[in-house]
């Protein structure tokens, strides 16, 4: 089991240890495909392999359409700042358990001993991104403990999460850029099967978002893990070389590194709602 403590990232304005990315949190591709199938309500991939083709609305209850994405919450409904709890499905309880084993705590201060019941996550939000979809820069708000863990699924669909200082990323151009074109404070390349964990100032003092895909995520100097992005681009080398050749033929010179997304990306955002309606469990 990968340990969170071995995968910290350094970012401006963020305390050491408050930002981490485990590249292969789900180490086995077949396991990731099975988890993705469970999340999507039993939708099958071709030949039992990774799910890489776009789908209509995922099957099963609870799915809603929001800003071009299909979303579903498990663990209960958040009304205001209070969770009306309901049982987590088995795939979510397994994920919460694995987060604890990896050292991810959801205490009131954004950490704490993962083994303590009070520090365990109680809510998971699934987002299904069709090709080209992003999410506006946002904060998750005070209803949750100040820590979020995001698991990325979809074998051919990496993404770049961009973080903006509070007030600089509240909308504008295309779904993941800062207001008025503000530059991100830092960005993180999210390969499939990776787990991003952020807490502290990364959670409370920054907005995070993913740009709408208008040809791919262009890698810039804000990226904290450029080597991982370059390795991914190299693995997808044929398309990259073709793009580069076309750029040179058109006299545009060296093309910037661009991360192409596949047709289906699913993220699982795991958090703990601080206030839970006592004595109420919706079945």
Where are these regions (language model features)?
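Non-heme Fe(II) oxygenase metal-center motifs and adjacent flexible, charged/small-residue loops
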Residues: 1-243, 248-283
């Amino acid at each position: 089991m990968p340990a969170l403590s071995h995968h910290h990232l350094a970012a401006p304005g963020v305390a050491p240890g408050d930002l981490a990315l485990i590249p292969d949190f789900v180490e086995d591709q077949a396991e990731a495909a099975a988890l993705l199938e469970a999340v999507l309500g039993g939708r099958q991939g071709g030949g039992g392999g990774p799910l890489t083709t776009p789908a209509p609305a995922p099957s099963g209850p609870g799915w809603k359409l929001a800003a071009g994405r299909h979303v579903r919450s498990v663990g209960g409904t958040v009304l205001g700042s209070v969770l009306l709890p309901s049982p987590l499905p088995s795939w979510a309880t397994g994920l919460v358990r694995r987060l604890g084993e990896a050292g991810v705590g959801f205490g009131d201060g954004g950490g704490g001993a993962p083994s303590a019941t009070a520090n365990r996550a109680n809510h998971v939000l699934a987002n299904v991104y069709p090709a080209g979809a992003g999410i506006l820069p946002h904060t998750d708000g005070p209803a949750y403990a100040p820590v979020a863990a995001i698991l990325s699924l979809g074998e051919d669909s990496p993404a770049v999460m961009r973080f903006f200082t509070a007030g600089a990323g509240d909308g504008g151009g295309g779904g993941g850029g800062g207001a008025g074109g503000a530059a991100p404070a830092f960005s993180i390349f999210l390969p499939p099967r990776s787990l991003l964990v952020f807490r502290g100032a990364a959670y409370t003092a920054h907005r995070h978002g993913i740009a709408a895909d208008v040809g791919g995520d262009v890698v810039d100097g804000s990226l904290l893990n450029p080597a991982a992005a370059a390795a991914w681009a190299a693995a997808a080398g044929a398309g990259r070389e073709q793009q580069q050749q076309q750029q040179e033929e058109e006299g545009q010179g060296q093309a910037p590194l661009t991360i192409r997304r596949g047709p289906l990306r699913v993220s699982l955002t795991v958090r703990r709602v601080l206030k839970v309606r006592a004595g109420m469990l919706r079945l």
